[in-house]
Amino acid sequence: MPKMKSHRGAAKRFKLTGSGLVKHYPSNKHHKNTHKKENRIRALKRNLVLSKSFQKNIREILPH
């Protein structure tokens, strides 16, 4: 059986924590920020944890 490979696009966007949760950075922060409120930009800096239904999908494509 061939070796399982990680989905490289997902590997760059999602990180698995030690407890098995999946973290990611939210979108809408990289450019065109001048019209956005400071509170919104500050909130977009934080890592977010995916919901359980999405975590299952991400774990399947990130076996390592």
UniProtKB/Swiss-Prot annotation:
UniProt KW keywords: Ribonucleoprotein, Ribosomal protein
Plastid listed as a keyword: no
Designated name of the protein: Large ribosomal subunit protein bL35
Gene source species: Symbiobacterium thermophilum (strain DSM 24528 / JCM 14929 / IAM 14863 / T)
PROSITE patterns: RIBOSOMAL_L35
Gene3D superfamilies: 4.10.410.60
Family: Belongs to the bacterial ribosomal protein bL35 family.
Chain positions covered by the region annotation Disordered: 18-39
InterPro entries per record: Ribosomal_bL35, Ribosomal_bL35-like, Ribosomal_bL35_CS, Ribosomal_bL35_sf
A GO molecular-function annotation: structural constituent of ribosome
PANTHER family assigned: 54S RIBOSOMAL PROTEIN BL35M, LARGE RIBOSOMAL SUBUNIT PROTEIN BL35M
One GO term of the biological process aspect: translation
Cellular component aspect of the GO annotation: cytosolic large ribosomal subunit
Keyword Ribosomal protein recorded: yes
Compositionally biased intervals (Basic residues): 26-39
Pfam family, one: Ribosomal_L35p
Segments traversing the membrane: none
